[in-house]
Amino acid sequence: MFLAQEIIRKKRNGLALSAEEIQFFVKGITTNAVSEGQIAALGMAVYFNDMNMDERIALTTAMRDSGTVLNWQSLGLNGPVIDKHSTGGVGDVISLMLGPMAAACGGYVPMISGRGLGHTGGTLDKFDAIPGYQTEPSSELFRKVVKDVGVAIIGQTGDLVPADKRFYSIRDNTATVESISLITASILSKKLACSLDALAMDVKVGSGAFMPTYEASEELARSIAAVANGAGTKTTALLTDMNQVLASCAGNAVEVKEAIDFLTGAYRNPRLYAVTMGLCAEMLLLGGLATDEADARAKLNRVLDNGRAAEIFGKMVSGLGGPVDFVENYSKYLPQSQIIRPVFADTQGYAHSMDTRELGLAVVTLGGGRRKPGDALDYSVGLTQVCALGDKIDASTPIAVIHAQSEDAFAQAEEAVKKAIRIDEVAPEKTPEIYAYIRAADL
């Protein structure tokens, strides 16, 4: 039997907690035996004194086990259960293509996603733009769609990782969100509750990333790869670029459109393609669905080119309550804003740098993201045709097209976009889409 205050005291004094102490405290979070003040105190103690790798693994697995842990064995799946998670960015629409692509190659992808946070867009918000799509289905329907279609992208259900839900809300209000140990446990407890065989982790770097520096992003990526592998899930973390909008757009309905255009081959943004392929190929390799990277990429290109990935996306949408002909007729179903107009730079030259975070906040201001939890979203608004760094910009080349519901909203977004995209006489140096892979062998 332990006392919560003694566990807090031990961590406050910089000592390592045992797995049993961590399990006791997490159980108290779940049952309310531990108070908000005690949770906040432990969070702050961890923030200042950190956790070693054994503590991080113990915290992650204890939070994973605080609620339902999904079991796929009874379904008799004939392939690996694989997934990816992103720390979030702007125009990060990867999940919508990657899930169906991995499923088309023989994987099963039970993807539990989140809503928008701060300047970053949420995968669930994009699906809410599709009429009828159930982002919170019953667990029976979720399992059925995963088994029959190969992929289902839904929101976190109440019985998954309840300890994280309570801990996170307290961290958010007590300035302990930025702890690498606590971020690692929060992300992975949710993913590992899905009983994955393999996970590809997308850790963003740059002006639109959650972590402020490359070094902080790398530290988080290493922590996630080490803890996930230590907890028994084959995991690779990729460090990917978020110094500019990843897709050609940012918003909800506009990103769904770009995802379908990508899957059908109508248009594939080269940067989006590079990161999607990198993550998806890693999932196939970790899941044993490909012999090497070249084989993985060939398989993925095949399911894009033969239409199988697009077909699976359509089946997932209809399986979860959306229109049966959504892929073929998405323009009939996706909402459109009142004003769709380009914005031009005041000077000529090259798109030199981008404050990606500010572009994400411009979408929030338009109504496409939340200023506070519970805000209703306007799924039609956002940015499209966002220029890429290095693009030549002149008087006839828009730096973006704004989708707004009023002239006031357009004017506000126009000012934000102009401020966020810097034009220079000199083209910037090209940066890679993927900076590094952190695999189990690298730890």
Curated annotation (Swiss-Prot):
EC number: 2.4.2.4
Sorted UniProt keywords: Glycosyltransferase, Transferase
Gene Ontology terms for molecular function: 1,4-alpha-oligoglucan phosphorylase activity; thymidine phosphorylase activity
Catalytic activity: thymidine + phosphate = 2-deoxy-alpha-D-ribose 1-phosphate + thymine
Known pathway: Pyrimidine metabolism; dTMP biosynthesis via salvage pathway; dTMP from thymine: step 1/2
GO CC list: cytosol
SUPFAM superfamilies named among the record's database cross-references: Nucleoside phosphorylase/phosphoribosyltransferase catalytic domain, Nucleoside phosphorylase/phosphoribosyltransferase N-terminal domain, Pyrimidine nucleoside phosphorylase C-terminal domain
Cited PROSITE patterns: THYMID_PHOSPHORYLASE (PS00647)
One GO BP annotation of this record: thymidine metabolic process
HAMAP family: Thymid_phosp
Family: Belongs to the thymidine/pyrimidine-nucleoside phosphorylase family.
Subunit-structure text: Homodimer.
Function of the molecule: The enzymes which catalyze the reversible phosphorolysis of pyrimidine nucleosides are involved in the degradation of these compounds and in their utilization as carbon and energy sources, or in the rescue of pyrimidine bases for nucleotide synthesis.
Protein name: Thymidine phosphorylase
Organism: Shewanella sp. (strain MR-4)
